Amino acid sequence: MRDKKTSYIRLLHASPKAPAVDVYANGDNILADDLSYGEFTPYLPVMPGTYTIDIYPADNSDTPILTKELVLPEKTIATIAAIGELPELELFIVEDPKEPLQPNTSKIRFVHLSPDAPAVDVIEPNGSILFKDVSYKDITDYLSITPDTYTVEIAPTGTDNSVLFVPNIRLLPDAFYSLYAIGLVEGDPYLQLLIPLDGNSYIET
């Protein structure tokens, strides 16, 4: 049985061109082993508190590429993303807030983690704008949407110059999703969209 104060975190490697990494908390507690770019860990139960997070290149624990203190409140559900380009790697926290969800609906939000992309709009093919003028490191509010299969495009704000086209996004009912834009508009790895099921869909805190 979990402590009533337990929090849940997952890790996301969203740093373009960074190698696969190992992530440790408070010295020797491993949170992620050989986590590659674009990958998430499962949600991990952790106690609230202050943690020292060390990120190393996978299988090389000599010198961390990032050391950061992380304060985690109780009963939090969150994604901890490694973002930015080396050597300016940083940790970015995306909380999954608990909020009402009407039966047979979905909720989506957009998280802009592409370090060289401008502010963008997220658009449906019919021109309907789902999210507008979202800048780097912005997290939108959740938007209620009918469960279905969707296509979206990402374009610099106020233009129809699509930089990413993503078809066949299947949204299930009674679920929360985040659309994470990662990668680079100019360079490799190119911009892509990750669409995981958020922990607030199924984790009770």
Label for each model-derived stretch:
Residues M1-T205:
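Intrinsically disordered, low-complexity polar regions and short flexible loop motifs
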